[in-house]
Amino acid sequence: GCYLTPGLIDTHVHYSQTGWADGRPDARDVRAEFPYAQAMADNQAHPERFHRAFLHSGVTAVFDVGGYPWTRGLAAACEHDLRAPYVAAAGALLATYDPKVLMLPDQSQFVFPKDGEEARAAVRSHRAFGSAAIKVWLIETPERSLASLVPIVMAAGDEARRVGLPLIVHSTTLATAKVAVAAGAQVLVHSVEDHEVDDEFVAAMVKQGTFYCPTLTVR
């Protein structure tokens, strides 16, 4: 006989990416042959390509954890469409690092708060425009130490709680992941890569109730 099982939930997707180099010129730059602007225009015009891929894989709900502003509209567009999964989308990322090549002339998928007050303002703006979560792209650089970024992340987390949105964080080092959890992150969207996680980190996650999304990659 036949039976139905609950659909899978993919907690880390990006409708603003393609799954290939044309959507991430910061990883491999193929823009000379495959223009980034065209790839992004195609994504916006034809999200049904991804809808089909998800549904055919048994995925009936997805969490878009950061992208161009138009991704926020997918939730309403897909809610009653049987040809699409349920979508929750964070919208633009609050970023501590500027990748430059991942932006378009007329829109950006990043906001760059310089301090805690700007982070709070960005959170309020995201809430007003319908974001389902606040995504912080927490990346240390030689120009910006983790210590200098802590006030921004903490302010974003505090303001997210105030407006009733979950805080989700890209933090791939143990040090940044600990800061993210301390700021109230409900989801870490990547595994820690530089060290084995320690008891302190695990205890903090359990206390906070943080979900750990490994975001495994098949190579």
Please annotate each region the language model reported.
Residues 3-78, 182-183:
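Metal-associated gating/positioning segment near the N- to mid-region
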Residues 64-108, 113-118:
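Mid-domain alpha/beta scaffold segments of enzyme catalytic cores
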Residues 101-158:
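Active-site gating/metal-coordination segments in enzymes
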Residues 7-13, 62-64, 87-91, 134-136, ...:
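Hydrophobic faces of well-ordered beta-strands that scaffold small-molecule active sites
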Residues 59-61, 82-87, 130-132, 161-165, ...:
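Short, well-ordered coil/turn segments that N-cap beta-strands
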